[in-house]
A protein has these predicted regions:
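Catalytic alpha/beta active-site cores
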Residues: 1-265, 283-286, 290-297, 325, ...
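A generic alpha-helix surface/boundary motif
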Residues: 144-145, 274, 316
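A non-catalytic, amphipathic alpha-helix used as a structural packing/dimerization or gating element
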Residues: 188-191, 229, 271, 275, ...
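Short glycine/threonine-rich loop-to-helix capping motif typified by GTGT followed
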Residues: 217-223, 259-271, 300-314, 342-352, ...
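Hydrophobic alpha-helix feature that most strongly marks membrane-spanning transmembrane helices
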Residues: 271, 277-285, 319-326, 330-334, ...
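Hydrophobic alpha-helical bundle architecture
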Residues: 282-283, 303, 314-318, 322, ...
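Catalytic alpha/beta core domains of metabolic enzymes, predominantly
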Residues: 295, 301, 310, 321, ...
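Active-site or pore-adjacent capping/gating segments
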Residues: 330-385
Length: 385
């Protein structure tokens, strides 16, 4: 039997000091909070800021989705909310068009007007939590306009709202419904990105590597795609829109997929942080530490949730959630045990959200920054010796 990573790299039965003989600590790892940020961006990790623990909502009418969001808050959703657009809105089709008759509110929230967004956010605060609305690239500017308009209607300065409501077009070929031309989607994304950058609005644009990996890509390919997207978007904002890199880099965030190959998933995100830090400094000439840091959100892998024996998906979700926590993510969404055949039931959603709570409060993973960074594993046996 051959033991290998999902991208074909042979795995040895045991590893020792010789396997890291060429590694220099300051160059390749660094302390948490120090360049190249392999071990994380904050020296105190989750002690200073716990990751956002949330579930993705979106089914039925805006009123239905609003009830689900409130239910998630009652279940203990922490730090933010997340909604996904339905295919009608993502395809830029109006909700009352005949083409939309059988698709409104299917696989997402029917957000084709400001009124729909107001109903979605009824009695839900715009501040004090991150506001995330996922969907295709074409209606990105609409989703951003909804947030700004509703904030102004509530008497809130739009710069006080933070989250993500627009996405790059790179995810469209990998499972998203978007019939608009790539060039148009890119223009709309850059329009939204330039607007938030110049107006100091803390809404980010998603670069969703998750779509690629959920469509069959392996970890190495996903890492390459994610870095390529970052380089392209930041390059266009600097070269075509005239932004300073330090302003451009505040826009993108990376949504990565975390599967069940535990150590590979952790290594992938650690590598992403380090490689982006070096690209920011060496290619773009980053002038600040903040510009070398990438906001990374995690979604556990939906494609690993099987239709057969769905209760086994609880174990898969727990493993993936622990991996997501180990990498020092900013936010985490879980897939659910019924992910393969239905929108989350109340029980499935509660179990997935509780999985995050258990990982955060009962495993000790939040007690130490970068526990996967070997030193903890080495020190623990010494303490018991």
């Amino acid at each position: 039997m051959k033991y290998a990573t999902d991208y074909g790299y042979e795995i040895k039965p045991v590893y020792g000091p010789g396997d890291v003989a060429d590694m220099e600590y300051e160059r390749d790892l660094g302390d948490p909070g120090s360049f190249p940020y392999t071990r994380g961006y904050h020296e105190n990790g989750y002690r200073s800021r716990m990751w956002t623990q949330r579930m993705t909502a979106g089914l039925g009418s805006s009123s239905d989705a609003n009830k689900v969001l409130k239910k998630y808050r009652e279940m203990g959703q922490i730090g933010g909310m997340c909604v996904i657009h339905d295919r009608v809105s993502s395809s830029c089709i109006d909700a009352d068009h005949p083409l939309a008759k059988r698709e409104n509110g299917v696989l997402g929230w029917p957000g084709s007007s400001l009124l729909e967004f107001e109903e979605l956010m009824q009695d839900i605060p715009l501040t004090g939590q991150s506001i995330t609305v996922l969907g295709c690239s074409a209606p990105s500017t609409l989703r951003l306009a909804y947030v700004v308009a509703l904030a102004e209607k509530r008497g809130i300065d739009p710069t006080e709202v933070h989250g993500s409501v627009f996405e790059s077009p790179f995810g469209n070929p990998f499972g998203q419904t978007d019939a608009q031309p790539f060039d148009l989607n890119m223009k709309l994304f850059l329009d939204a990105a330039e607007y938030v950058a110049r107006n100091k609005i803390r809404m980010r644009g998603g670069l969703v590597g998750q779509h690629f990996q959920e469509s069959g890509g392996n970890n190495a390919q996903a890492l390459a795609i994610e870095l390529s997207m970052l380089k392209e978007i930041c390059g266009r904002l600097v070269d075509e829109r005239g932004l300073e890199f330090e302003d451009a880099v505040r826009v993108p965030y990376q949504l990565v997929s975390i599967g069940s190959r535990f150590f590979e998933e952790v290594a992938k995100v650690r590598a992403l942080r380090r490689m982006w830090a070096r690209m920011a400094k060496e290619h773009f000439g980053a002038k600040t530490e903040k510009a070398c840091q990438l906001l990374i959100a995690v979604h556990t892998s939906g494609r690993t949730m099987t239709y057969q024996q769905p209760l086994n998906n609880v174990a898969r979700c727990a493993i993936q959630t622990l991996a997501g926590a180990m990498v020092g993510c900013t936010a985490l969404d879980n897939a659910t045990l019924d992910n393969a055949y239905a929108e989350p039931s109340a029980l499935a959603a509660r179990m997935s959200l509780n999985t995050q709570h258990i990982v955060a409060s009962e495993t000790g993973v939040a007690d130490v920054v970068d526990p996967h960074g070997w030193f903890l594993f080495r020190r623990k046996p010494d303490q018991r010796g």
